[in-house]
Structure formats: C-alpha cells, structure tokens
Amino acid sequence: MEPTAPTGQARAAATKLSEAVGAALQEPQRQRRLVLVIVCVALLLDNMLYMVIVPIVPDYIAHMRGGSESPTLISEVWEPTLPPPTLANASAYLANTSASPTAAGSARSILRPRYPTESEDVKIGVLFASKAILQLLVNPLSGPFIDRMSYDVPLLIGLGVMFASTVMFAFAEDYATFFAARSLQGLGSAFADTSGIAMIADKYPEEPERSRALGVALAFISFGSLVAPPFGGILYEFAGKRVPFLVLAAVSLFDALLLLAVAKPFSAAARARANLPVGTPIHRLMLDPYIAVVAGALTTCNIPLAFLEPTIATWMKHTMAASEWEMGMVWLPAFVPHVLGVYLTVRLAARYPHLQWLYGALGLAVIGVSSCVVPACRSFAPLVVSLCGLCFGIALVDTALLPTLAFLVDVRHVSVYGSVYAIADISYSVAYALGPIVAGHIVHSLGFEQLSLGMGLANLLYAPVLLLLRNVGLLTRSRSERDVLLDEPPQGLYDAVRLREVQGKDGGEPCSPPGPFDGCEDDYNYYSRS
C-alpha cells in the first residue's frame, strides 16, 4: 500500500497542473491569440505544402522516367542543377522548355539533373492544378458544413487530412500516388483554410482588430509560398525526398494537438458553442450582389499571379536570356511589398474603415498596370519591380476585401462565416485551377504579351466595379440576429414576440442608407432603409 501514496500525490499534482494550464489557455484574450497562431500555422503549412513540391516532383518524375529511384552519378563532367525556385515560380519546371544545363567546372561527382519531357509537362501541370480543382469542388459543401459544426472541428479535420496528404507525398513512388496526395491536400485545404479564416473573423468581430488579424494570416500565406521552394529544394538535395514532407507532417500534427488543447472541440462547452444561429445558405450568399462583386475582385486580382507563374520563366529565357538563378530569384523580392501592402491597408482601414472599397480598387489598378508593364521589361531589374507591384496590389485587394466579406455577412445576413469564406476560397481556386493548365496554351496560341495585357486590362476594367461597394461602410447592424431568425413564419407563442417586434419598429428606428443594390431589397431584406 505504500507506493500508492506517492502515486496518488503525483496524480493530484498532475491534475492541478493540467487544470492550471487549462485555465490559462481558456482566458479569453490569450485563447484568441492562440487561435490566431494555430490558424496562421495551418495556413502556412497549406501554402508550404502547395509550393514545396515545385523543385521536387518534376525532378523525381524525370528520375522515374529514367528507370531509377535516385539520380545517376557521373564523375568526369558535372552539370549544375536548377536552383530551387521561389514563391510561385513553378514556371522553371512547368514551362514547355527543354533547356539543357551547360557543362562547366572541374571534374567531380554530382547528381545529374533530369528534365521533364513535353508530355510530362502536361502531367505536372495537371498535378499542380488538381489541388485547386478539388478545393473548388469541395468548398460549396465545406462552407455549410462549417456553418453547422462551428469552426474548430472542421479545422481539425482539415489538419488531419493535410497530415495524411503530407505523409502520402513522403512515401509516394509513382505519379498516381502523387496525384492522389495532391488532390487529398485540396480536400484538407477546403476545410482548414475556410474554417481558419472564418474562425479569425468570428474571434475578432470588431474593426480594426479583424483587419489586423486577417492581415497577419495573409502574411503567413505569403511567407509559406516564399519559403517552401528553397526549403524543399535544399532538403531534397541533401536529405532525400521524404524529409521535407515528414517535417511538414510533424508540424501539422503538432498544430492539430495544440488545437485540441486550446479549443477542446469535443468538450461539452464546445458543443454548446456549436449551437450557432442558422447561417444563410451558400447559394443565397452567392446571389448577394455585394458578395458577388467582392468574389469577382478576388478572382480577377489573382489571375495574373496564377497565370504568370507557369509561363514567365520560359519568356524570361527567350526574351532576356535569363540565367537559372534569375528565373529562380525573380519572385523573391515580391514578399517585401506584399507584407508592406498588408501593413499599409491595415493601418488605413483602422483610420478610414469606410474606404475599404477604395483600397481594393487601387489594388486592382496597381495589378493591372503592373501586368501590362511585364511584357515591356527587357532586363531583370525592371521585371522584379513589375512583379513587386503585382504582389503589392494583390495584398491591397485581399487585405481590404476579406474583412469586407465578414462585414457584409454581419449587416446583411447572419454572423456565421463558413459559407462566405468558402466563396472566397472558391474565388482563389478558380484562378489557380486554370493557371497551370490554361496559361501555357494561351501563350502558345496568342503570345505572352497578349496574355499579360489581357490580364492587366481585366483588372483595370474591374476596378471601377468596386464603386458599387462605396456605401457598404455606411451600413450598420440595424437588425439583430434574433430579428433575422424572426423573419421565418412565426409559430405558436412566437406570434406575440413577432407582434411586439413589429410594433417596436413603427416607432421610427434609425435605419441604414440604401446601397446601389437597393432593388434587391425584397430578396435580401436584412437591413432597413429610410
């Protein structure tokens, strides 16, 4: 019986420690910050996994074509391997080019690089697009699921699916497995990305905190896209194919465990929190003209980036005889203006929150001008400046319009954010599903100059459309969520409640001014007008 006393004391001490840690984690402000960290890590992982395969998969598929699991060793003449591309520079591998490295240097042993054939370029393009395609298909279902289940459980599901996808990438040995892993990542992203952004909007209901938190999330997305190709290329070169994926899988598992500790998604309190008001169906949100304008802007602003990624390297080689390091480094400086754009928009939104539409329109104009200038660049430095302008404009649009979506749901619908951010994810996925597959064909049929000018013109023409959002900042939460629920036909005792609500409104309650879509009042009767 003597050993039981120390055991009981240890158990009691562990219980007290667990309770103390749990109480600290449940403190509202601290929990909100931890949730932001968890979501940012999830977004970082998703974008790192999206880009980490850029220097790995094309080379590995070429090795499989050669009939060997590992690159061939040569001892007399060495050929330099491609430097790992940066940010979204998948073009060094996706472009239809048969560039061969130049023999140089002293005699030493090194891995011989292999390059995809033209047919493999098509397979790699489909592989890169498969993630966005599945994400595009799943988001109309994941949004309502998130609205019904709250945000923590779908985020946990997304992290679990991303963990499985990453492990599958690590042990993949053929194209079919790579394709399945990439598609599985799209399934995980449809849950993790949408629920993560929606959770931030829910935890930070007031401005400017909401814009600031979403800006931090966008910075992590950009950083993940930037750091993933060199991270994957270096580890692939020195540690093998599996190591970068296993590292990302470990971080994904840690993030999921941290979410379990902080949010406790399966506890009784979490089940009580899950009793959210019934959200507006996603098809009705899609028909809301304000939300449609924002979704169109998000798609339009991302098309130049998605279409330039797989084509710009070949154009650089043919136009300015760019070296391999220039093609690999061309996107690297763009991270700085992207973060600067996020910071600037957050600061401006804090001071002038009613001008979010103007920041988005300015971003579209900057994207349009930058895209039109790209074909005129004949050297490396001007091209870098143009791409920096492109990413700066994208930061303005994303940082201004993502909080606007949450605000529109607050004032025109029910404050449940899963479906509206599923629409935002659909907007991004449209661009990135088409880019790797369509961009090369457009360049071959029309030319790179026509592609860039067309995308720039589309952004310039769409910028004035955001004028339709100019009155959004003047809308107020003139009706509560309870009032929205009472729009349904009353039953039983609720007749009296509805009667009192109607009588209260006859007293001259202040109303919000109408927007340019006041003709849609009958369909979206969620705010009053004088």
From Swiss-Prot:
Keywords, comma-separated and alphabetical: Cytoplasmic vesicle, Glycoprotein, Membrane, Neurotransmitter transport, Synapse, Transmembrane, Transmembrane helix, Transport
A biological process from GO: positive regulation of acetylcholine secretion, neurotransmission
Distribution of this protein across tissues and organs: Expressed in the spinal cord, brain (excluding the cerebellum), brain stem and cholinergic tissues. Not expressed in peripheral tissues such as liver and kidney.
InterPro entries: MFS, MFS_dom, MFS_trans_sf, MFS_Vesicular_Transporter
Cytoplasmic side: 1-33, 147-152, 204-213, 264-288, 347-356, 410-422, 469-530
Entries under PROSITE patterns matching the protein: MFS (PS50850)
Span list, region Mediates interaction with SEC14L1: 471-530
Reactions listed under catalytic activity: acetylcholine(out) + 2 H(+)(in) = acetylcholine(in) + 2 H(+)(out); choline(in) + 2 H(+)(out) = choline(out) + 2 H(+)(in); serotonin(in) + 2 H(+)(out) = serotonin(out) + 2 H(+)(in)
Annotated spans, Disordered: 504-530
Carbohydrate attachment residues: 89, 96
Site (Important for transporter activity): 193, 398
Transmembrane segments: 34-54, 126-146, 153-173, 183-203, 214-234, 243-263, 289-309, 326-346, 357-377, 389-409, 423-443, 448-468
Disruption of the gene: reported phenotype: Mutant mice die shortly after birth. Embryos at 18.5 dpc. show abnormal neuromuscular junction morphology characterized by increased number of motor neuron and presynaptic nerve termini and muscle fiber necrosis.
Gene3D superfamilies with a match to the protein in the record: MFS general substrate transporter like domains
GO molecular function: acetylcholine:proton antiporter activity; monoamine transmembrane transporter activity
Compartments, as annotated in UniProt: Cytoplasmic vesicle, Secretory vesicle, Synaptic vesicle membrane
Protein topology in the membrane: Multi-pass membrane protein
Side Lumenal, vesicle, residues: 55-125, 174-182, 235-242, 310-325, 378-388, 444-447
One cellular component term from this protein's GO annotations in UniProt: cytoplasm
Keyword Membrane: yes
Function: Electrogenic antiporter that exchanges one cholinergic neurotransmitter, acetylcholine or choline, with two intravesicular protons across the membrane of synaptic vesicles. Uses the electrochemical proton gradient established by the V-type proton-pump ATPase to store neurotransmitters inside the vesicles prior to their release via exocytosis. Determines cholinergic vesicular quantal size at presynaptic nerve terminals in developing neuro-muscular junctions with an impact on motor neuron differentiation and innervation pattern.
Family statement: Belongs to the major facilitator superfamily. Vesicular transporter family.
Subunit record text: Interacts with SEC14L1.
Protein's name according to its UniProt entry: Vesicular acetylcholine transporter
Source organism per UniProt: Mus musculus
Gene that produces this protein: Slc18a3
